[in-house]
Amino acid sequence: MKLSRNTVRVLAVTLIAGSSLFITSCGKTKTTEATNAAAATTAAPIIKETEAPTEPVAEITGAPGSEKETEAAASSGKLKTSIQKYEVNSISVEYPVVSGMENTSQQDKLNEHLKENALSILKNYPDSKEPMDESQDTLEVKCTVISADSGRVTVTYEGYYNMKGAAHPNNLFYTNTVDVKTLKDLSLKDAADPYTMAAYALSEEVAFVTADPEAAKAVAEGLKAVQKDMTVEQYQECLEKADFPLKKGSDGKTVTWPASFSYESEGTLYYSVPVPHALGDYIIIEYDITTK
């Protein structure tokens, strides 16, 4: 069954929330008050890793292409997948587990790699200098397997993060595409040219995905107010740093969480763009790489 969504075409200049947002989205700064509160000592947490429920959670909207997950499992040549969950206090992160590979050693390495990337948000969001406090912060991340076969595994993650003492939670979206044989993380640069994607995002042909028509109108109207603050070069830089593996920041030491993530599904490239919290924190642009 196809995912219900509206593809809304708007002027490219309405898609970016300004250079100030662009910069802060790469590493949100925690307040001193909140950081001090998070430093309070607590008892050692109990970590649980369980099989996640198979029923989807209503408040988390599946990424485009996720409707093919069940079909993929039944198709010839596809790998079997299940979802497990890491839980500690108010932290909950789902991650995929692959089964059915003939090479069980490679399967174990693949599963460890997928899990490591899924949970890396705990230590690297917004960056490795200010990791999440698993004893006091709240995080919920749902995992969707877009596709899984002998060539690659593609997964999306959606949810929210609420730091203790913060004014509001942040909506999250990240992805991971892994080459099954090499365990290499594939990024936007492996599917398309970042400059071309930046120019597309600033063109009149750009399209983004939303499940709510009213939300689409709000996004388009809200972004018009900050259209003048973004350039192709700034957006290109964002896309060049998109996806796993995680990169070090300007200091050469701190690992910084990407401002953009991407994945490909049936000839369409999807990539996220940071926007103001009032507009949802991110939007997803779609680009048909088979016809352009």
Describe each model-derived feature in a short phrase.
Residues F22-S25:
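C-terminal motif of bacterial Sec signal peptides marking the signal peptidase cleavage site
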Residues G27-P45, A52-K292:
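Compositionally biased intrinsically disordered regions enriched in Thr/Gly
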Residues T14-G18:
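Repetitive helical segments and hydrophobic/amphipathic motifs
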Residues K2-L11:
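Bacterial N-terminal signal peptides that target proteins for export
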Residues M1, T50:
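Hydrophobic/aromatic pocket-lining and membrane-interface residues
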